[in-house]
Amino acid sequence: MKDIYFQPKHAAMSRRSLLLAGLGTAMSAPFLASCAGFDTSGATAGEGTVGFLSTQFTPVEEKQRYEAVLKKFAKAPVAYNSVDPGVFSSTVSTQASAGNVKTSLLGGLHGELAPLAESLEDVDNLLRDLSGRGFTKEMLELTKVGGSTSRYVPWMQATYVVAVNKKALEWLPSGVDVNDLTYEGYLAWAKAAKQGAGRPVFGMPAGPKGLHHRFYQGFLLPSFTGGQITTFRNEDAATAWTYMQELWSALTPASTNFDNMQEPLARGEVLVGWDHVARLVNAPANNPDEWLMVPAPRGPKGRGYMLIIAGLALPKNGQERDLAEKAIRALSEPLSQIETLRSNAFFPVVQTELPSDLTGAIALEAAAVRRQQRSEGALLALPPVGLGAKEGEVSQVFKNCFQQICLENRPIQQVLDTQATQLNTILQGLNVPCWAPDPISTKCEVA
């Protein structure tokens, strides 16, 4: 694994607590707990301590593992307080409005930080100092959250890939490269495997808590249409859903029961499946030599892939600014990034060589993440940004398309037109700009 570098190609992360319940399903005693003075309302840490408010690693075990990383690498005393996104947003906004900021450092997903941009310090100078870390152009552009200056420093990342039991390679069609799949090749493989095995052996997480909507948002539609929202009902989108309808006929119908793919993959019910890296990691845990992790397929517009990126931000008028900057510098160093990967399965955002002693599953995923980001035509997509409590309603629109097109066989264009109206109704009430891969605009809506 020494040839693995996290340096995505320069192209033309849903809550982690849900995804990483115990490292396998998704993703030391608490450091300085006694002197933290830090509660879920964001109360101040003690003097000389970085009060770190974050949306990440909320389960107790994850939090404790990350506190151990901070204790080892942060180069400053840190009181780490993990809260849900709603508390995070209200705490930052309320303290900023009151002119009484008690935090020093903020950590959250891009979509959680972007709406708070006006309450965050410009970190352009800090990023210039860290230019040697190898943050990609795409990531640096995202840190500007639609403005002209950066509001956070990339912290860690995750994405979605395809897990392959090597037994399925028996049915890989001639000319199809498992490490460079096209959607056409993926469909042909699924059909051949179904025929060869006598049953469908491809699956997807289409259960009640599955993340299949992220497949349509970040992979299928960007790959076929080049967008996610603006292209939602155009001719290319209809082609994408026609494809999805045909693919569904080759997938196991039990997919509608799968909340994650690692369990059906591990028991052999499914041999090939797409999901979040944190929801695949247990599948090859006991026999990594029998597995591959590969990039998602590419389509007519490129290889759409959804990036889950978390960032570190400085609240305006925050406490212990020098120590907070020191912590950011330390947490962007390769060794601390690798330790975060080991402990909580979030991948580095810096260019770094990964050690050869990573666990088999993590090593497999690391290779797939790298290939996916560096592939020709890689097209970065983000989860919805700035929707707040409405994100669930937007995600439901994509789930409705799957339900009505793939399960109920309703006319595709009719479904897209109806759901586009619903999507625009939600977005018009929010008046937010679009997110990648759609172009930045003052108002996001379906064309």
What residues fall within each predicted segment?
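N-terminal export leaders
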Residues: 14-23, 169
